[in-house]
Swiss-Prot record:
Known role: Catalyzes the ferrous insertion into protoporphyrin IX.
PROSITE patterns: FERROCHELATASE (PS00534)
Pfam families found in the cross-reference section: Ferrochelatase (PF00762)
Molecular function (Gene Ontology), one example: ferrochelatase activity
Membrane-crossing segments per the record: none
Species annotation: Rickettsia prowazekii (strain Madrid E)
Localization: Cytoplasm
Identification of the protein by name: Ferrochelatase
Amino acid sequence: MNKRIAIVLFNLGGPEDIEYVKPFLFNLFYDKAIINLPNPLRYIIAKIISITREKKSQKIYSLIGSKSYLIQETEKQKLAITEKLKEFIKEDFIIFINMRYSTPFAKEVIGQIKEYNPSEIILLPLYPQFSSTTTGSSVKNFLQNIDIDIPIKTICCYPIEEDFIKAHVSIIKEKLYDKNFRILFSAHGLPKRIIKAGDPYSFQIKETVNKIVKELNIKDLDYKITYQSRVGPIEWLKPNTEDEIELAGKLKKDIIIVPISFVSEHVETLVELDIEYKLIADKYKIQYTRIPTLGTNKIFINSLTNILLRFINNTNTNLVMSSSSKRICPNKFTKCLCNLTN
């Protein structure tokens, strides 16, 4: 009998309309992986943040049509993966989308999966580099809500997957020019305390960038890894993307910015990178080139499809590993999903 496979794509989510901004913010900051405090304190803080930031966030979303593009981008990726996967397998499968902080939530998706009645589930995060605050939170939430006994295979990350790297290299090469430029590989920031607690995120970001730089094979390439989207007074990963654009401006170096941890266009790319950070470059009259996210890039979709095929064909019914089916993080990273779920 052929397998029936439920594939679940994990992503952050976002407000479908301006009125959903506050509940989205509440869900985000109520997550214990984001604010690790006990209730009722975490609930109170999430309420305060969602109320105080609502108007500012609504104004930001109004710049891109008053909604999150991430939702429709994820739908496009789902369709592209579905079509590609059909070329390789005869098994029956359905791809579901599970957003962490907006609909469709885990309970809703699990209900749909139960109706489908699969023989196994494969979890695929649309976060190439693992963090306990993104993939870790989504996987934990899904497993806490599932109430059926089905084998579950979990892809924790794919920061150095061959075609994932090739997809980035291909897009970057299209935008390169023979000028005095610096590449900034901009990743979403994290508080340093999360990294110090054993989260492998920044390690995996470096691994991704090292592979891309090696494949670009440009002598004396001027590049830096930077971090964006910091919030609040606590210490975050450095250097900050906006500070590095400022520095490049003072040096009269043109900027090529690569959103290295994002695979979908959303508020952090369309507003923060395209509008806010570009203003810094404009102030110094330097050229500012923003590389698109991978989206439905054919090489990237091939990469995700190949990862899924590897896990579909793996006989380990409860596999939790990187895309290469082995652990890639040093043991000091205790928050690695391989530690948390095995």
